[in-house]
Regions:
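N-terminal glycine/serine-rich phosphate-binding loop of ATP-dependent small-molecule kinases
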Residues: 1-3, 7-92
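Gly/Thr-rich phosphate-binding beta-strand-loop-beta motif of the actin/hexokinase/Hsp70
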Residues: 1-25, 117, 123-145, 161
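ATP-binding/phosphotransfer module of carbohydrate and carboxylate kinases, centering on a glycine-rich
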Residues: 2-4, 157-234
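Glycine-rich phosphate-binding loop plus the immediately following alpha-helix
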Residues: 31-38, 106-108, 113-122, 127, ...
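Short phosphate-engaging motifs
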Residues: 35, 69, 135, 157, ...
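Generic hydrophobic alpha-helical segments
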Residues: 39, 43-47, 113-117, 121, ...
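Short beta-strand-loop/turn "lid" adjacent to the catalytic site in phosphate-handling enzymes
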Residues: 50-106, 142-149, 153-154, 182-193, ...
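Glycine-rich phosphate-binding loop signature in dinucleotide/nucleotide-binding domains
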Residues: 50-55, 120-122, 210-213
Length: 234
């Protein structure tokens, strides 16, 4: 069984895979202050919830966009499973052909998104990963990573809206009843949710126009479920 850890700016996703199937997936908050022991306790508790014994873990892999936390997570895995986790990064052999100006700059999260997408879906691909930032990746019909786009994330946009204005309140991320809203809170919800959904629709159109062909579109990340249902493109 493989223990997989995805370290994002806001959340850490932990899961186990066996024989190509996902045994479970859970999410905890990313804390740059936590020690290896604190993370080890969290991971051990999650494994116990799913009745997975530490000696059942044969290997571990980490994808991280938070360098200051990466080593701490690796030490935490060593504590609970007694194994050295592999870290996805420059030099990791994934088989992905990366055609960008500096392949070493491509984040590990985008690498694993692309590798998984190529494995599971019909090419060419557009992959949206919606977390603290929203990233859009394009993989061509040959399975090569061409590049993409980085967009302010849903919560980043919402927080900027409330922080930069004096009279706009903090709101929950839930859809209003109508796109054309009639009060401040619903107008903000409409702008964030339908605005982000329209942004994604527009990016897809522009990517496909530049590629000259239709693509399979995939969305992942903690905030995708809040936005993707309101996209016109399926």
């Amino acid at each position: 069984m493989i223990l997989a850890i995805d370290v994002g700016n806001s959340n850490i996703v932990i899961g186990c895979c066996e024989d190509g199937k996902i045994a479970f997936s859970e999410r905890i908050s990313t804390s740059r202050e936590n020690t290896a022991l604190e993370y080890a306790i969290s991971f051990k508790t999650i494994l116990e919830l799913y009745n997975i014994k530490q000696n059942e873990i044969d290997g571990a892999i980490i994808s991280s966009v938070v360098p200051s936390v990466t080593t701490t997570i690796k030490l935490a895995i060593k504590k609970i499973a007694g194994i050295d986790a592999k870290i996805v990064g420059p030099g990791t052999k994934t088989g992905l052909n990366i055609i960008i100006d500096n392949p070493a700059q491509l984040g590990s999260d985008l690498v694993v998104d692309a590798v998984a997408g190529i494995s599971e879906y019909k090419l060419p691909l557009i992959i949206f990963d919606m977390g603290t930032a929203t990233t859009a990746s394009v993989i061509d019909s040959k399975g090569s990573y061409l590049g993409g786009m980085i967009i302010p994330g849903v919560n980043v946009s919402l927080n900027a809206l409330t922080a930069g204005t004096s009279q706009l309140p903090k709101i929950n991320l839930e859809p209003p009843k109508k796109v054309i809203s009639s009060n401040t809170v619903d107008c903000m919800k409409s702008g964030i949710i339908f605005g982000q959904a329209s942004l994604i629709d527009g990016v897809i159109d522009r990517f496909e126009e530049e590629l000259g062909q239709k693509c399979t579109v995939i969305a992942t990340g903690g905030l995708s479920g809040s936005i993707i249902p309101y996209c016109k493109r399926k």
